[in-house]
């Protein structure tokens, strides 16, 4: 059986995002991939101040019932609800938009204004350009998402 992971992730995201938003959470990402001997559907959600285990259980109950009705995935899988984590890698432009205002560390593919590593706050995200206010100098850099080799959240004060 041919499995189009991206298509499944897209459909799941379209279906669960309004429900998760209606519960007061933000949908960070959806991942569907083989792990061990089976498949895992990972719903990554967050809210201001962080998400609790009880929140994950509540999301799981609602999302599980919804996915059973929609029947997008025609075989058994493990449903996992999780938070993005404190230093989760930012792998999609949407991730930067999700974490506006937060401190990030970027490793660039090529230097921009003489820098290959940038630590700063996400100011804005528009048309694939991420505006980062440098932590040290306060200067705003306009960095194309395509120029980022690695990006991750940083913990303040470490």
Curated annotation (Swiss-Prot):
Q: What's the short name of a Pfam family annotated to this entry?
A: RimP_N
* Organism domain of life: Bacteria
Provide GO CC annotations from the record.
cytosol
Record's keyword annotation contains Transferase: no
Spell out the InterPro entries in the cross-references: Ribosome_maturation_RimP (IPR003728), RimP_C (IPR028998), RimP_C_sf (IPR036847), RimP_N (IPR028989), RimP_N_sf (IPR035956)
Question: What's a single GO BP term from this record?
Answer: ribosomal small subunit assembly
Q: According to its UniProt record, where is this protein mainly located?
A: cytoplasm
Q: List the disulfide bonds.
A: none
**Any idea which UniProt keywords this protein has?**
Cytoplasm, Ribosome biogenesis
Protein location: Cytoplasm
- Keyword Zinc: yes or no? no
Purpose: Required for maturation of 30S ribosomal subunits.
- Identify this protein by name: Ribosome maturation factor RimP
State the organism of origin: Aquifex aeolicus (strain VF5)
Q: Which gene encodes it?
A: rimP
């Amino acid at each position: 059986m041919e499995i189009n992971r991206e298509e499944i992730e897209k459909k799941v995201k379209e279906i669960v995002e309004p429900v998760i938003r209606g519960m007061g959470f933000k949908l960070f990402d959806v991942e569907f991939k083989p792990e061990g001997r089976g498949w895992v559907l990972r719903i990554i959600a967050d809210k201001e101040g962080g998400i609790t285990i009880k929140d994950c259980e509540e999301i799981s109950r609602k999302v599980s019932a919804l996915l059973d009705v929609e029947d997008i995935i025609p075989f058994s899988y493990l449903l996992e609800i999780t938070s993005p984590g404190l230093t989760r890698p930012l792998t999609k432009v949407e991730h930067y938009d999700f974490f506006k205002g937060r401190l990030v560390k970027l490793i660039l593919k090529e230097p921009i204004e003489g820098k290959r590593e940038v630590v700063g706050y996400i100011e804005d995200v528009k048309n694939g350009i991420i505006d980062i206010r440098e932590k040290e100098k306060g200067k705003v850099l306009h960095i194309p998402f395509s120029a980022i080799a690695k990006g991750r959240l940083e913990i303040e004060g470490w």
